[in-house]
Amino acid sequence: MQFHSSSALVTPFKKDLSVDEAVYEALIKRQILQGMDACVPVGTTGESATLTHKEHMHCIEIAIETCKNTKTPSNSRMKVLAGVGSNATSESLSLAKFAQKVGADAILCVSPYYNRPTQQGLFEHYKTIAQSVEIPVMLYDVPSRTGVSIEVPTALKLFREVPNIKAIKEASGSLKRVAELHCYEKDFHIFSGEDSLNHSIMFSGGKGVVSVTGNLMPNLISQMVNCALKHEYQQALEIQDKLFSLHQALFVETNPIPIKMAMHLAGLIENPSYRLPLVAPSKETIKLLEKTLQQYEVIA
């Protein structure tokens, strides 16, 4: 993968629950200007499960066009890791082909949820999607949401047998699993998919992060990753410790409920709107978010 720090973008909605394209573009530009290497549209945090196929594709297009038209501080272009996950292989395949056609740099594909395929089913699912495109593919293991895990032998087999499967987003919560993957395949790039473990995964062989907190604090997430890549353990740990209470607050309810409310409180999105079955956070969660953002001087 040609990037290391990335944010799993929220999808802002208007009051009528249509996608707020202007705010979405502004959020991506903010990521670019604050030093992130890549953005990840329409993943879990982007509420992809409740977007229509047309909306999903359009969000990918917006991300790609915004990144093409906005230079980073180093005068380069931020990469787009397009989410193409679905519990139907045919739909993921269609989204993958579309993402490649419109210029995505790579695709992120989650394991099918609800279906609970066998390991052979997971292998065939990912292989079929990856072989339909030429751009790099990042597997996404998040068993708490999908009900099934990509077991280490399956992940390694995919990496070894499918040339454009290059990376895996690890949200299993298991550092033992991260260590095992890195032990057997040093070139299989591991990305943290769990903000509270960013530092631990980076110093267990990780190559980057796909961060939820990065929506709010892209500069600090980028700094932490860059320090880790330079083997500056203590500096990276200081940033991780600084962000830890924010990481915790953003996951007190189902993601992306807290992060969208936090971004609203911070003035980054106008409407903290959600599509059912997701609903607004509790009053207790809002108070916690307000207190946490005050501690970080994000709000007064």
From Swiss-Prot:
Keywords, alphabetical: Amino-acid biosynthesis, Cytoplasm, Diaminopimelate biosynthesis, Lyase, Lysine biosynthesis, Schiff base
Site (Part of a proton relay during catalysis): 44, 114
GO MF entry, a single one: 4-hydroxy-tetrahydrodipicolinate synthase activity
Record pathway: Amino-acid biosynthesis; L-lysine biosynthesis via DAP pathway; (S)-tetrahydrodipicolinate from L-aspartate: step 3/4
EC number: 4.3.3.7
Subcellular location: Cytoplasm
Transmembrane annotation, as ranges: none
InterPro entries xrefs: Aldolase_TIM (IPR013785), DapA (IPR005263), DapA-like (IPR002220), Schiff_base-form_aldolases_AS (IPR020625)
Residues holding pyruvate: 45, 210
Principal localisation: cytoplasm
Disulphide bridges, residue numbers: none
Record keyword Amino-acid biosynthesis present: yes
GO CC annotation: cytosol
Catalytic residues (positions): 140 (proton donor/acceptor), 169 (schiff-base intermediate with substrate)
UniProt cross-references to Pfam families, sorted A to Z: DHDPS
Catalyzed reaction equations: L-aspartate 4-semialdehyde + pyruvate = (2S,4S)-4-hydroxy-2,3,4,5-tetrahydrodipicolinate + H2O + H(+)
Gene3D superfamilies hit by this protein: Aldolase class I
UniProt record, GO biological process: diaminopimelate biosynthetic process; lysine biosynthetic process via diaminopimelate
Keyword Transcription regulation listed: no
Role: Catalyzes the condensation of (S)-aspartate-beta-semialdehyde [(S)-ASA] and pyruvate to 4-hydroxy-tetrahydrodipicolinate (HTPA).
HAMAP family with a match to the protein in the record: DapA
Family membership noted in the UniProt record: Belongs to the DapA family.
Complex formation: Homotetramer; dimer of dimers.
Protein name per UniProt: 4-hydroxy-tetrahydrodipicolinate synthase
